[in-house]
UniProtKB/Swiss-Prot annotation:
Positions that bind Mg(2+): 69
Pfam family, one: Tubulin_C
Protein's name in the database: Tubulin beta-2 chain
PANTHER family for the chain: TUBULIN (PTHR11588)
SMART domains xrefs: Tubulin, Tubulin_C
Keyword Flavoprotein listed: no
Keywords: Cytoplasm, Cytoskeleton, GTP-binding, Magnesium, Metal-binding, Microtubule, Nucleotide-binding
One GO process term, biological-process aspect: mitotic cell cycle
Subunit structure: Dimer of alpha and beta chains. A typical microtubule is a hollow water-filled tube with an outer diameter of 25 nm and an inner diameter of 15 nM. Alpha-beta heterodimers associate head-to-tail to form protofilaments running lengthwise along the microtubule wall with the beta-tubulin subunit facing the microtubule plus end conferring a structural polarity. Microtubules usually have 13 protofilaments but different protofilament numbers can be found in some organisms and specialized cells.
Cofactor(s) needed for function: Mg(2+)
Main location: cytoplasm
GO CC term (a single one): microtubule
Bilayer-crossing regions: none
Length: 444
């Protein structure tokens, strides 16, 4: 019941995804061969959200893994949980997308997409009542961004009423892997605005900062970064997988977080984040979690919530705690920082409580916020995009795959529209509406 189908694409998506499965397997007591080794019935109660139970009693992840080159797939397959996935669900090409969005979306990716969709259909038919899809990908490369958005639009056509949630890794401000990231990211956002329901925005730089500043890791690896992401991913869906006092699911999350359909890009955070050495000295309390969770240093994307205002936010707590205390803390946050919340959406923070904490912690919380300050990320990518596009730099790589310059112009203006929409609601006040109605009346 209420299954989620997980899809990972490209190198980044596959690396995040495989880390995520390690976390979820651990939470449900499933060992690398798919056997249940857990100790508590709670782990099995709703294990079918993410797993299919095979006839021999093994649990198989509802996961589809795709890439345009075999390398990362082989790494996943030989990794710690590589044997747990259904072998048919690995779909890969041989050519690679070479960091080129057009290859992922129009040429190489388009050739592979049908075999991916076959696997997706097969998995969806295995579901009792599919709730939605979660896609892990990055927006800077070629496969995750180009082919990822192609898959999202195809799934949107075929399953229009299912939730589509993405975990999207944006290009970072200072750390760049490839020079054409701004192109790939802008073309992807253009697609995500139209076809996704909720996007959790991540970026490597913010994750590096968390590892470096808070977790005191001197040389953070991608493994450390992906571990942070997977903790958040597990937190977002824990309410579906474990019993709780106040449940939430993908659709409830969307209804509570998205006041306007295009503004569905969220900042995420996780608490408690403690360095490995100091874990045992901490006593976790709800106020402490709440404070850390709302802290701007905890946000997993490089935008500062203090530069904008929250339209809405949602907090998912895990562990044994009193819901009354949770509610008090959330009201407390809103009262103390009222200037950071828009006043024309009253009670705009939703909380949910799930009884089962993650492994190794007595309680934890996951934060998802819809803040207007996320426009900083889009604005930054857009500036880099314009700088290159004005000179038509690197454009031949895209037009050579059959793309039109027009598509670039459209993507650019869509991104700029998104930025101005965020700005418009950041500046809006509650009494503007009244003025507007008076003007209307006067006009009539």
């Amino acid at each position: 019941m209420r299954e989620i189908l997980h899809i990972q694409g490209g190198q980044c998506g596959n690396q995040i995804g495989s880390k995520f499965w390690e976390v979820v397997c651990d939470e449900h007591g499933i060992d690398p061969t798919g056997r249940y080794m857990g100790t508590s019935d709670v782990q099995l109660e709703r294990v079918n959200v993410y797993y299919n139970e095979a006839s021999c009693g093994r649990f198989v992840p509802r996961a589809v893994l795709m890439d345009l080159e075999p390398g990362t797939m082989d790494a996943v397959r030989t990794g710690p949980y590589g044997q747990i996935f259904r072998p048919d669900n690995f779909v890969f090409g041989q050519s690679g997308a070479g960091n080129n969005w057009a290859k992922g979306h129009y040429t190489e990716g388009a050739e592979l997409i049908d075999s991916v969709l076959d696997v997706v259909r097969k998995e969806a038919e295995n579901c009792d009542c599919l709730q939605g899809f979660q896609v892990c990908h990055s927006l800077g490369g070629g496969t995750g961004s180009g082919m990822g958005t192609l898959l999202i639009s195809k799934i949107r056509e075929e399953y229009p009423d299912r939730m589509m949630m993405t975990f999207s890794v944006f290009p970072s401000p200072k750390v760049s892997d490839t020079v054409v990231e701004p192109y790939n990211a802008t073309l992807s956002v253009h697609q995500l605005v139209e076809n996704a329901d909720e996007c959790m925005v991540l970026d490597n730089e913010a994750l590096y900062d968390i590892c470096f500043r808070t977790l005191k890791l001197t040389t953070p690896s991608f493994g450390d970064l992906n571990h942070l992401i997977s903790a958040t991913m597990s937190g977002v869906t824990c309410c579906l997988r474990f019993p709780g006092q106040l449940n939430s699911d993908l659709r409830k999350l969307a209804v509570n977080l998205i006041p306007f359909p295009r503004l569905h890009f969220f900042m995420v955070g996780f608490a408690p984040l403690t360095s490995r050495g100091s874990q045992q000295y901490r006593s976790l309390t709800v106020p402490e979690l709440t404070q850390q969770m709302w802290d701007s240093k905890n946000m997993m994307c490089a935008a500062d919530p203090r530069h904008g205002r929250y339209l809405t936010a949602s907090a998912m707590f895990r562990g044994k705690m009193s819901t009354k205390e949770v509610d008090e803390q959330m009201i407390n946050v809103q009262n103390k920082n009222s200037s950071y919340f828009v006043e024309w959406i009253p009670n705009n923070v939703k909380s949910s409580v799930c009884d089962i904490p993650p492994r190794g912690l007595s309680m934890s919380s996951t934060f998802v916020g819809n803040s207007t300050s996320i426009q900083e990320m889009f604005r930054r990518v857009s500036e880099q995009f314009t700088a290159m596009f004005r000179r038509k730099a690197f454009l031949h790589w895209y037009t050579g795959e059959g793309m039109d310059e027009m598509e670039f112009t459209e993507a650019e203006s869509n991104m700029n529209d998104l930025v101005s929409e965020y700005q418009q609601y950041q500046d809006a006040t509650a009494d503007e509406e009244a003025d507007y109605e008076e003007e209307e009346a006067a006009a009539e």
